[in-house]
Amino acid sequence: MSHQYVSRIIWTGNRGAGTSGYRSYDRSWDIAIAGKPVIHCSNDPLLGGDPARMNPEDLLLSALSACHMLWYLHYAAVDGIVVTRYEDIPMGMGEVGAGGAGRFTAAVLRPRIAVRHGSDIAAAHAIHGRIH
C-alpha cells in the first residue's frame, strides 16, 4: 500500500528586497497542509533564525520520535502489552562546517514508558528493536 503526502512550504521572509544580500531577508517560512493549521517556522537560531519558531531540525527530530512512538504503541497493542504513559525527550546533534553549512549528524531517542502492572517488561523493551 503506497501513501502520498503533500505540503506547501512558503517562504515568508522577504523584507522587500528579496535575497539581494545575505542579511536582507528573514529565514522564516510556513508549512501549509490542506485542512490543517499553518505552522510558522524559521531557520535554526545558530543560522540566523527566529528562536521562537520551529526549525527543520526541531521538526525532523520530532518526526523521528513520533514515528517511533506510534510504532511502539502499535506493537504493544498487538502484543497485549498495555502502555499507560509514553514520553520521549529526544536529542539531536548537528554541526556547522568551516564553510558555514550546517548538517544534522545524529538523533538519540530516550523514551520513558509506563506499562500496566504485571506486563512482560522484557517484551516491552524488545519492541524497540522491531521498529525501523
What are these regions (language model features)?
Residues 1-62, 73-132:
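Extended beta-strand/beta-hairpin segments
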Residues 64-68:
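Alpha-helical metal-binding/catalytic segments enriched in His/Glu/Asp
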